[in-house]
Design a protein with these regions (language model features):
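Alpha-helical transmembrane segments and their helix-helix packing motifs
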Residues: 1-173
Length: 173
């Protein structure tokens, strides 16, 4: 097992290859990651949508959702939230800030496209009609809840999520 210092050194060295990767390769890996995270989200909704106890439903969803992140880490796909950690290599002058920004934009757009692609496939597959439409209603309820968060709450939740994703990426380094 690597020490934290060794894990950081490994990750920083790996970032050099990431930022220099051709845009089309980054984009394809990012589409894949977006789909995998969407699989995790869809799986957590399927697992939790028909559980009456809110606490248990959230626990089940919380256990299933990280499967998407595990797929991303194991396949080497590119996820925006984890790639934000590449700023460590920028600070150490392993690459320029411009290269980091280019990578983050390409990965963000690829993640968005991948998640939208999987959402469309889920819709066409009829998945949202499961349980007499209860899964679709649950999905809408979750989406509305997230859309109605005030800016500060959404930002704080996003930061906390990013900390957890970066921790997972470092553990995998």
């Amino acid at each position: 097992m690597l020490s934290m210092k060794e894990a950081i050194e490994n990750y920083v060295e790996g970032c050099v290859g990431k930022v220099d990767c051709p845009a089309y390769k980054l984009f394809m890996k990012a589409i894949l990651a977006g789909m995998m995270i969407a699989f995790g989200a869809a799986g957590s909704s399927v697992a939790a949508h028909d559980i009456a106890n809110v606490g248990i439903a959230r626990l089940v969803a919380g256990v299933v959702f990280p499967m998407g992140l595990m797929m991303v880490v194991m396949t080497g796909a590119e996820l925006f939230t984890g790639d934000c950690l590449a700023i460590m290599a920028t600070v150490q002058k392993k690459h320029t800030a411009l290269k980091l920004i280019r990578m983050l934009i390409v990965v963000y757009l690829g993640n968005l496209l991948g998640s939208l692609m999987l959402t469309c496939i889920d819709y066409v597959s009829g998945q949202y009609n499961y349980s007499s439409g209860i899964l679709g209603a649950y999905t809408i309820k979750v989406a509305l809840g997230k859309c109605n968060l005030d800016f500060t709450t959404a930002l704080a939740s996003g930061i906390l999520c990013n900390i957890l994703v970066c921790a997972a990426v470092m553990l995998a380094a």
